[in-house]
């Protein structure tokens, strides 16, 4: 009976994934974000499910239904605030998780990495369609601007945009289908996350040193279960502080006004977690060029394993690469700031320089830094 977890067909899978899993003894707090993303996904599915019970995906009543949730539904305000700020926490954890993968060379587990990039794209799609649902001013105009980018595709663009809209502009049909997409995507993301974990467990976790840790492994439980539990508590603390004390801090004031197709906001921008990509999109004064740059800014992650030139896996002992990594981080923060600014000087030129630096760092400077570090480590006698 005591060893049922090792023999029962279902419990055996859980046991091999979360209890008796051999884990490197030296993984740091940067390895907490995978489990934190799992918690974020569960929070979002649960709060979203209860919100969907009261929401109506109709242009005439969508905005009112959200107001009704906040005013009349028991703890509806809390559900909405947790769901909206939970999305911000989700992306914060995602960016840190990807950053950790780049810093410590985890991208060399190619299958795990590629599924992770697909997951990132799917979560971004889910967040975009979800942002449209409250049918506020910025929801509507954000949807109009971003879906309109499809029309930049040669020959089929306009047809494709109208197919997505279900008409000649963003309207009732668009809102209804976006709600359907937003509801189904978490149930696509969950199995993808399980496959992501499956491939990770084929190789075992990477560790800060980047050296094969097989000679020094410890069981996942209790060591890393307690460590993850601490992460959960900190995540929930930050989420509750956001949701209870400043729920609208990361939102857009324009979304307090119902969508009005006849009145364009002076400055259309997405949520903060898309601003870096939005800045790259805007930095190119050509519609198709901007769309290609936007796609490249995310899809570039897929070729990072091919750009690894260093003899060492991790950046832990590579100061030149470390410096470039932190310049890249600062550059992404700059792009996020620029994405939220109006299209005028000096923001235009800063955005263009930051966009150019983003691609130069990843495609040119970091691979060269790896080769330079290899050369410096060679014995010179």
Swiss-Prot record:
Recorded family membership: Belongs to the cytochrome b family.
Membrane topology, record value: Multi-pass membrane protein
Bound cofactor: record note: Binds 2 heme b groups non-covalently.
One GO-annotated biological process of the protein: mitochondrial electron transport, ubiquinol to cytochrome c
Subcellular location: Mitochondrion inner membrane
Sequence intervals crossing the membrane: 33-53, 77-98, 113-133, 178-198, 226-246, 288-308, 320-340, 347-367
Pfam families listed in its UniProt record: Cytochrom_B_C, Cytochrome_B
Positions with a binding annotation for heme b b566: 97, 196
Binding residues annotated for a ubiquinone, in chain numbering: 201
Binding site for heme b b562: 83, 182
Gene Ontology cellular-component terms listed: mitochondrial inner membrane; respiratory chain complex III
Any one Gene Ontology molecular-function term assigned to this protein's record: ubiquinol-cytochrome-c reductase activity
Required cofactor(s): heme b
Organism: Dasyurus geoffroii
Assembly behavior: The cytochrome bc1 complex contains 11 subunits: 3 respiratory subunits (MT-CYB, CYC1 and UQCRFS1), 2 core proteins (UQCRC1 and UQCRC2) and 6 low-molecular weight proteins (UQCRH/QCR6, UQCRB/QCR7, UQCRQ/QCR8, UQCR10/QCR9, UQCR11/QCR10 and a cleavage product of UQCRFS1). This cytochrome bc1 complex then forms a dimer.
Note in the entry: Heme 1 (or BL or b562) is low-potential and absorbs at about 562 nm, and heme 2 (or BH or b566) is high-potential and absorbs at about 566 nm.
InterPro entries: Cyt_b/b6_C, Cyt_b/b6_C_sf, Cyt_b/b6_N, Cytb/b6-like_sf, Cytochrome_b, Cytochrome_b_C_euk/bac, Cytochrome_b_N_euk/bac, Di-haem_cyt_TM
Gene3D superfamilies to which the protein is assigned, alphabetical: Cytochrome Bc1 Complex, Chain C
Sorted UniProt keywords: Electron transport, Heme, Iron, Membrane, Metal-binding, Mitochondrion, Mitochondrion inner membrane, Respiratory chain, Transmembrane, Transmembrane helix, Transport, Ubiquinone
Name under which the protein is recorded: Cytochrome b
Keyword Transport belongs to the record: yes
Function field: Component of the ubiquinol-cytochrome c reductase complex (complex III or cytochrome b-c1 complex) that is part of the mitochondrial respiratory chain. The b-c1 complex mediates electron transfer from ubiquinol to cytochrome c. Contributes to the generation of a proton gradient across the mitochondrial membrane that is then used for ATP synthesis.
């Amino acid at each position: 009976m005591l060893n049922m977890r090792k023999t029962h067909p279902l419990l055996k899978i859980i046991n091999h994934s979360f209890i008796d899993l051999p884990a490197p003894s030296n993984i740091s707090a940067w390895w907490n974000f995978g489990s934190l993303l799992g918690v974020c996904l569960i929070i979002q599915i649960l709060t979203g499910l209860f919100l969907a019970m009261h929401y109506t995906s109709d242009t005439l009543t969508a905005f009112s239904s959200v107001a009704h949730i906040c005013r009349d539904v028991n703890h509806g305000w809390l559900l909405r605030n947790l769901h909206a700020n939970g999305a911000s926490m989700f992306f914060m954890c995602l960016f840190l998780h990807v950053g950790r993968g780049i810093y410590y060379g985890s991208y060399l587990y190619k299958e795990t990495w590629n599924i992770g990039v697909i997951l990132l794209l799917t979560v971004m799609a889910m967040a975009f369609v979800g942002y449209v649902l409250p049918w506020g001013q910025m929801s509507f105009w954000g949807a109009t601007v971003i879906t309109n980018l499809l029309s930049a595709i040669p020959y089929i663009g306009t047809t494709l945009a109208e197919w997505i809209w279900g008409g000649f502009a963003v309207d009732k049909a668009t809102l209804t289908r976006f709600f359907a997409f937003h509801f189904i995507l978490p149930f696509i993301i969950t199995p993808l996350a399980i496959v992501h974990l499956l491939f990770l467990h084929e190789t075992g976790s990477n560790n800060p040193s980047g050296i094969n840790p097989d000679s020094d492994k410890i069981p996942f439980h209790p060591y890393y279960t307690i460590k993850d539990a601490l992460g959960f508590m900190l995540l929930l603390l930050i989420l509750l502080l956001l949701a209870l004390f400043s729920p609208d801090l990361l939102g857009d004031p324009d979304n307090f006004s119902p969508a009005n197709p006849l009145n364009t906001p002076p400055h259309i921008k997405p949520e903060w977690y898309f601003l870096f990509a939005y800045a790259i999109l805007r930095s190119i004064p050509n519609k198709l060029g901007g769309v290609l740059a936007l796609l490249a800014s995310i899809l570039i992650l897929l070729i990072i394993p091919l750009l690894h030139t260093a003899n060492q896996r991790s950046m832990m002992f590579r100061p030149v690469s470390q410096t470039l990594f932190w310049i890249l981080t600062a550059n992404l923060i700059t792009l996020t700031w620029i994405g939220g600014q109006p299209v005028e000087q000096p923001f235009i030129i800063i955005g263009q320089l930051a966009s150019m630096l983003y691609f130069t760092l990843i495609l040119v400077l970091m691979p060269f830094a790896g080769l330079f570090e290899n050369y410096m480590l060679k014995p010179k006698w």
